[in-house]
Amino acid sequence: QEIYSNTVNITVTPYSSLLDLSTSLGVVGSATPGGWGNENILDLPFYTTATTNVYVAYVTLRNGEIKFRNNNDWSENWGDDGADGTLDSYGANIAVSAGTYKIEVNFSSMTYTMEEYSWGIVGSATTNGWGGPDMMFHYNSFQDDWRAVVTLGDGEVKFRFNNDWGVNYGDDGADGTMEANGANIAV
């Protein structure tokens, strides 16, 4: 016996499986791999957020200075004349210490923030053990992913944020799915 339902019209809008959040805004400076405008290396990119005029970058920097600029060009650039978190057009270089950061710029309020932002592996299977420091992931801003090259021995590991147990992931049930505060992962 055949069964029929009422006809329903729907509209389907296809989209790319890869969501492009890129912008023309970038991080440049002596603290970046490209230095102060190496023509062969692009500025570290910012990405759009859900908030208009707010952009975010995840960058690994060395000791040095940075600025923000548009289109890998100096015609539009921002620094910070008072080292107070205010974006100043053509402002002073921003001094930074080595580390991995989340940088957020807000062009509506003309402000920026920088906060430490790192992911790592900790545990008895790492060379540093449970006491850390964590074996760090490095953010690849050109492919938008976190990567680590580590040698693990027999033991257990967990993933955690900023070398702290406040945010950590394990695997309850050893099913390959990470859970917040989950069980240690056997290696």
Which residues make up each language-model segment?
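Insoluble glucan recognition modules
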Residues: 1-187
